[in-house]
Every structure is written in C-alpha cells, then in structure tokens.
Amino acid sequence: MKKDIHPEYRPVVFMDTSTGYQFLSGSTKTSKETVEFEGETYPLIRVEISSDSHPFYTGRQKFTQADGRVDRFNKKYGLK
C-alpha cells in the first residue's frame, strides 16, 4: 500500500439527534465538534437515525399491506 494516501482512521462518537443516544465507533469522518465520552474527548458526528431510533430495531415498525393483483382477484371473486 502507498503511504499517506489513506484517511486517518480514529475513534469517534456518533450521536442520534432524535434520541440523544451516543456510541463510540471507528471512522474516517471528521468533525469540528467534540464531546467527552467515558472520560475521553472524541470528535462528534451527528446522525438522524441509528439503531436506537430506527423502527426495524426498536420493534415499533408499522406494517402496511399493499393490495396486489392476487388480493384484488380474490376480493373480486370472493375467494377469501
């Protein structure tokens, strides 16, 4: 590998803006904001959705049923 062409990989704190949840992860993203997390200072990256607020992970998922061709056929001929 060539030297000095890759971005610096370092620990950063990601913060979910909708819930305030923070977690530490490695990333190449940069930020001017910093935050103290577990006694250390890290760059802060704000995200809109994380596993703490996404409906798939929280279990508050809404299921919508789209009527397809088979459903319309069954409804039309009273099969179901």
UniProtKB/Swiss-Prot annotation:
SUPFAM superfamilies, per the entry: L28p-like
Cysteines joined through disulfide linkages: none
Entry's Gene Ontology molecular function annotations: structural constituent of ribosome
Factors inducing expression: Part of the SMU_1296-SMU_1298 operon.
Pfam families, sorted: Ribosomal_L31
Family classification: Belongs to the bacterial ribosomal protein bL31 family. Type B subfamily.
Protein name: Large ribosomal subunit protein bL31B
Organism: Streptococcus mutans serotype c (strain ATCC 700610 / UA159)
Gene name, Swiss-Prot/TrEMBL: rpmE2
